[in-house]
Amino acid sequence: MKKQVAIVHYNTPEITESAIWSLRKHGGDYDVFVFDNSDERPFTAKMKGVTVFDNTKGQIIDFEKELAKYPERDDRIGCAKGCSYGSDKHMMSIQKLWELLPDGFVLMDSDVLIKENIDWVFWEGECCCGYISTMSPKRIRT
């Protein structure tokens, strides 16, 4: 199976495209998946080996509906209020990527340019595998 790289994209198509080109230049033959949450500037580049999950109109994740499930969330925590729940949206996008790509992937920020070979990132003995877990609010300690 080919190695998979996932990128969550928000309104910066030139930067995301440059990130993919740098990955291709210094990396192997990876399948790249772009989860597009743009509301102004979607990722429209046609690139071989790149699959776009289009969530620009909430086709995959309706963020307002999902955030409404947590009416008592604290808007003062982190940058949530200042960035329109960007962190929450990013987390939900990564969770959806786990569902869409169950065999695993390396998550890459869209604003990162690769300068050397990154095949070592795929060595299981050298990396951390993450997962998302849910916990009832009663079990969370503050």
Task: Go through each PLM region and give its residues.
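Structural beta-sheet core signal
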Residues: 5-7, 34, 107
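Acidic ATP/Mg2+-coordinating residue in the GHKL
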Residues: 36-38
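Conserved catalytic core of nucleotide-sugar-dependent glycosyltransferases
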Residues: 83-84, 114-142
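Short beta-strand-to-loop acidic/aromatic patch adjacent to the donor-nucleotide binding site
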Residues: 78, 102-113
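N-proximal low-complexity "stem/linker" segments adjacent to membrane-targeting elements
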Residues: 1-21
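Short, acidic, metal-binding catalytic loop of nucleotide-sugar glycosyltransferases
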Residues: 21-30
